[in-house]
Each structure stands twice: as C-alpha cells, then as structure tokens.
Amino acid sequence: MARKSIRGKEVVMVSDDDDDDDDDVDDDKNIIKCVKPLTVYKNLETPTDSDDNDDDDDDDVDVDENIIKYIKPVAVYKKLETRSKNNPYFLRRSLKYIIQAKKKKKSNSGGKIRFNYRDVSNKMTLKAEVVENFSCPFCLIPCGGHEGLQLHLKSSHDAFKFEFYRAEKDHGPEVDVSVKSDTIKFGVLKDDVGNPQLSPLTFCSKNRNQRRQRDDSNNVKKLNVLLMELDLDDLPRGTENDSTHVNDDNVSSPPRAHSSEKISDILTTTQLAIAESSEPKVPHVNDGNVSSPPRAHSSAEKNESTHVNDDDDVSSPPRAHSLEKNESTHVNEDNISSPPKAHSSKKNESTHMNDEDVSFPPRTRSSKETSDILTTTQPAIVEPSEPKVRRVSRRKQLYAKRYKARETQPAIAESSEPKVLHVNDENVSSPPEAHSLEKASDILTTTQPAIAESSEPKVPHVNDENVSSTPRAHSSKKNKSTRKNVDNVPSPPKTRSSKKTSDILTTTQPTIAESSEPKVRHVNDDNVSSTPRAHSSKKNKSTRKNDDNIPSPPKTRSSKKTSNILATTQPAKAEPSEPKVTRVSRRKELHAERCEAKRLERLKGRQFYHSQTMQPITFEQVMSNEDSENETDDYALDISERLRLERLVGVSKEEKRYMYLWNIFVRKQRVIADGHVPWACEEFAKLHKEEMKNSSSFDWWWRMFRIKLWNNGLICAKTFHKCTTILLSNSDEAGQFTSGSAANANNQQSMEVDE
C-alpha cells in the first residue's frame, strides 16, 4: 500500500503485490477498497510535482471533470458485465453497454429534423415536432436526405410555405412550416375555423419510434360485430313492390286495385268535391269509362256508381236488378233525394254523402218502369251568369271533312254566334238504353236536350272511339256511372200508346234559337254511329246533360217507326271554316301518351340523390334542364387547359402536347395522391404507346418526366422499368403488367400502388 498526495489530497493505492493482503480476499472487498475512478489511478501513475510551475489550471479542471463522469471504478463495471450473463438486468448497467448506446445515439442523430409550425405571418411558433430518417411529417415517406425532403415538401405539399435551415453548433437541421396566404385567399381553409393566425396548425402523424414489425398471423384482431335493425320504410322503393315513395312533400298515390274492373269504383270514391267558384266552369271528360246513365234490367253488372255534383233538388235515377258488384252513390250537393233502387243483391250497397238534407224514397223491385223513372228524373241546368269556356279538341276541324251533312237531317237555325258541341274520346255519353228495340223511340224522345240561348258559345267536347248518338239496348258486364248537372226538370206522365210516335218525336225535338251564324255539331271519328244498336254489350256508357226546364212527353213501346224518328232527330252539320289538317291516328297518340305517363310514373317512384352532395333531390329537380351547382364540363376544362398551355413562352409544341395529355389524363382519372402516380404512369404509357413510338420528341419528354418522378421518390425503379417495357413490347403483351385492361382517358380504372 502506498500513499501519494494529489493537490493536497491523500489517495490510497491498492496493489496486488502487497504482502499484507491475502490472495483469498473477495472481489467485493476489492470493489469497496477501490473508491477512486480509473482516471485517478492513471494520473497517479505519472509522476507529478506539486511545486512544478509548468502545470496550468486547465489541467486541474480536466482531471476533476473526468472524476465526476465516472461514478464507479473499472472493476465494478467488469463485475457487472460478468454477472449480466446470468442476469440480463445488469447488462444495461455495464460500461460496454453504455458506450454502445452512446455511439448508436450519435449515429442516429444525423437523420433527425425538427419541424416548427408557425402562424400565417411567420412570427410565432405554434408547435414543434422532431422526425427521424428525413421523413415527411405529413405523409411519413422517408426522403433519404435533406435535399430529397426539400424537393418532396415543395412538390407534394404546396399549400404550405417551408423555410429550411442547416445544422449548426447550437441546433440541428430545422424546417419552419407556415400556411401560404394564397391558401386562405382562395378558400382552401373554411371560414368556420375562425382566425387562422390565432389557430394552431393541426395535423395527424404517428410516432415513428413506436412503430414495430408485428406478425399479423399471431395477433389476429377479434371483431365485435353489432347488427343494427334497418328501417325498411325509410328506403326508396320502386313501383314493382306495390309501395308508395314520398319525395319531399307528403304525397301519396291512390290505392291500387287488384282488378281492372274496379277502377271506376276507386276513382269515384277518391275524388274530392270541388267547391263552386265565380270563375267559368270548364268541365272535362276523360277517355275511358266515362259516366253513363243507369240501364234497365242489366245482369252481371260491374261497379255501378252514380256521381252527382249539382246545386239544388237533384235526384238520381233508380237502378233495377243490378247484381254481383258494388253499387255506390256519391252525392256532394244540398237537398238531394235519391229515387228507389229495385232489387239489388249479392254485394255491398254503399252511399257516400257529403251534403245536407239527403232523403231516399223506398225501394221497389220492379224493373219494367225504369225507363219511365229516368224520364221523370232528368233536371235542366240553369243558365250561367258567366259564359262557360270548355276545352275544344284539336281534331274538331277534321269532323266535318269526314262526315257530310245528310239530306234527311234538318237544317239548324242561325244564331248570333256558333255553338259547337264537343265530345271526348272513348265510350262517350249516350242516352239511356232500353230493354228492347221497342223502347228506343221512347228514350230518344225523352233525352233530347233543348239548347238555351247564351251570349257566348258553348263548346262541349267529345273524342273518338265508340261514339254513338243513339241508345244501345240490353248492354251489360261493364262499369256504369252517371254524372249529371241538371236542375228541376219535370217529366210528363207516361202512356203505353205506340200509334203517335212520330208526332211525339216532332214535339220533343230541341228548340234552337235563331242566330245569324250556323251551329256546328262536332263528333270525332272512330266507330261513330247515328242509328241505335240492339243488344250491344261490354262497353262503358255515360250521359252528360246540360239542359234547361225541358218537359218530356209520355213514352210508348212501339218500335215500328224508329227509322223515321231517327231521321227527324239528326241535325245537319255545317262545314267548318278552319283549314284542312292531315289526320293523325288517335291510337298512336294515345299509345305515345300512355308510354310517356308510364315512364314518368316509374321515375316518380324512385329516390334520386345528388352526385356530389349525396343529398336527396326532388323529382322536379331531376327533370329540370338546369345544371347542378359546382358541376363542371370536361369539354370546357379541356379547352381552358389548352388555352393555358398556349400562353406559355419558350416551350415547344411537343412539350405542350405532352403536358396537355398528361394533365387531362390525371384530371379524368382523379390522380390525387402520391400512391396513384405509379399506376398512372403505367396506364398513360399503354394509352399513348403508339404516339410515343411515332414521335421521338414525345417519347423524350415522357422519359424526362419519369426521371423527375423517380428523383422525387414518387415512382420506384420497378415502375420505371415497367413503363419502358410497355413501350418496347407489342400491344398484345402490354396488358400483362397491371390487373386492369388498357387505360382509357375517359373511363376510370383500378389503381395499383407501389409498396
């Protein structure tokens, strides 16, 4: 043991050659004895003189710093290293482990860059982050160096402004990030974020120190599947599943009938009563199943309904022996009385009334006097205070051309203005039908209206098919409905005499007031008959009357002079003054109208959504010709892109051509991310392969562009090689590199991203 003094301090030296120490002393005791670090002992081995004037004060400071660094002697670290073989806990405390950790830390410090996120004015740092391996903090792509990171940030994240600083003594490499003023000016940031100068720049990134390689096969995530109930009523539906869809307003379609034979009942029960107004009334009669008067002694009938919309004291005629279907009467007036119904059975008889003081007389089972009852219940219409304007058919100018006036028809007296009778299309109104031909003359005498005088012309309208001006006898098996607008018509008593039929008919012909212009009776084309038909069946019949206080003579059952009666009842038709128009088939027009209505009905049953906002839109917006908001036209964008490139100076035509094709391709295929670029390069090479082969300058600019993409890390060498191989290969072999077919600039394709 030796004693030496260092700067006035006494240090104890322990040597292995000392005779006083035993060889069997434990290592722990030696560790306890060695209380000084290794540098102290090394300094003690060199001879030092405390009186030497050549030593400087700086050497004393270095020795003290070395002593402070090492808190344990070398033997302690050696002992910890040997013990760490059995217990890994001691490994991190050994000297070798600490030295390796420091070297690793120094080697890794070269790839760290600090990002300072500043406000718009670049005056205040809002947030700071340190990334490793020269990685981008936004997309986490390693750029390989300071220069590569600089190129990547400027090209891929152009919404921000970057300022780069090299590493110096006081700090490492840093990057200041701030939002460009143009980003706020052109509305990239929303207005609801408040003042962007006071709001910090927020972004999402992962801590790269915590990323580890994990085996997905061992760590399989178990998903907890939660099944939610789906409300089927909120889903859009079509018309195939017999359901109704509501767009914006609470609109519902009328109920559907399982049989086409019940359509008339559904329509009559769902029609709303329309209040009277001071405006002129414009009645309109549609095509199919138009209201007809009751028919006497009809069997196997379907859906008989009477719809009356009159003013005062209107009575509906009775029905005799109606069987096997619903009979419904719809009354919407005041003080209406219904005459008796005779012997109706086998179905529901329903009466729907929305008026006041409605009374019904008792029913009878007699069916012989039905025609007599009809004659007594026909009211007349009071003259209106204002002229009635009715819809005039566009085909009225063709009627007089096809049918000329007959010699047996009487001439019509002149009137101040022409009165045109207008009749609608199918199954048009006809007078009530009798049980046999013997009663045809009786019905005709009672159903001829008198035309009242008016200052304005009355234009009733009748369209084409199956029109008859005389009654049909013994019809059955179809829908029957009567719509009447008449008031206070008294009918005279009936007689059973048949001798004076011609005299009766002459007295019951409608009296037409004198006028200065002729009256024109207008009837449409198809299947028009001016004579009565016996035993006609399976067609709808309706009567619409607008008469004023006409007395009806008694009826007879004679049928001998029917032809003479009809000859006296037909008025003459005047020639129209309108120009001739070529006849168009009514059936073709009806077919086109029905197809259009069916198409619109199918569209109304669907729910449409906006292509960009994904919000439901109404059917009117779908059918409108206006464009939706923020929608752009590709053709207009192509023209603007071409004009923008034409303004460039110092650029060749081939380069402009290449830039135009690439920009159009990127916009139409929606290449918006860095991961889409490899797929876009391959598909662009396939699309313009032939043009690149024919033009060397085009191929040159394409190669230069790929080199720039490769330098910036947007494509890899594998993608570069694929593009070159596509250009050198035949057209049949070009499609084997990607999963999709050849690209098309106007169609979207599936994308493959380089890993």
UniProtKB/Swiss-Prot annotation:
Renumbered residue ranges of the record's region Disordered: 1-28, 199-219, 234-263, 276-590
Ranges for the A- repeats: 245-266, 284-306, 307-329, 330-351, 352-373, 422-443, 461-483, 484-504, 522-544, 545-565
Organ and tissue specificity: Weakly expressed. Expressed in late siliques.
Biased amino acid composition, Basic and acidic residues: 234-248, 298-309, 321-333, 346-355, 416-425, 455-464, 516-525
Domain of life: Eukaryota
Molecular function via GO: zinc ion binding
Region listing for 6 X approximate repeat B, in residue ranges: 267-582
Gene Ontology CC annotation, any one: nucleus
Main location: nucleus
Ranges of the B- repeats in the UniProt entry: 267-283, 374-390, 405-421, 444-460, 505-521, 566-582
Keyword Transcription regulation attributed: yes
Compositional bias (Acidic residues): 15-27
ZnF (C2H2-type) ranges: 136-157
Stretch list, region VEFS-box: 590-725
CDD domains per UniProt: VEFS-box_EMF2-like
InterPro entries named in the record: Polycomb_protein_VEFS-Box
The entry's keywords: Developmental protein, Metal-binding, Nucleus, Repeat, Repressor, Transcription, Transcription regulation, Zinc, Zinc-finger
Biased composition (Basic residues): 390-404, 474-483
Region (10 X approximate repeat A) location: 245-565
Signal peptide residue numbers: none
Coiled coil among keywords: no
Function comment: Polycomb group (PcG) protein. PcG proteins act by forming multiprotein complexes, which are required to maintain the transcriptionally repressive state of homeotic genes throughout development. PcG proteins are not required to initiate repression, but to maintain it during later stages of development. They probably act via the methylation of histones, rendering chromatin heritably changed in its expressibility. Required to prevent the proliferation of the central cell by repressing unknown target genes before fertilization. Regulates the anteroposterior organization of the endosperm.
Family: Belongs to the VEFS (VRN2-EMF2-FIS2-SU(Z)12) family.
Record-given protein name: Polycomb group protein FERTILIZATION-INDEPENDENT SEED 2
Organism: Arabidopsis thaliana
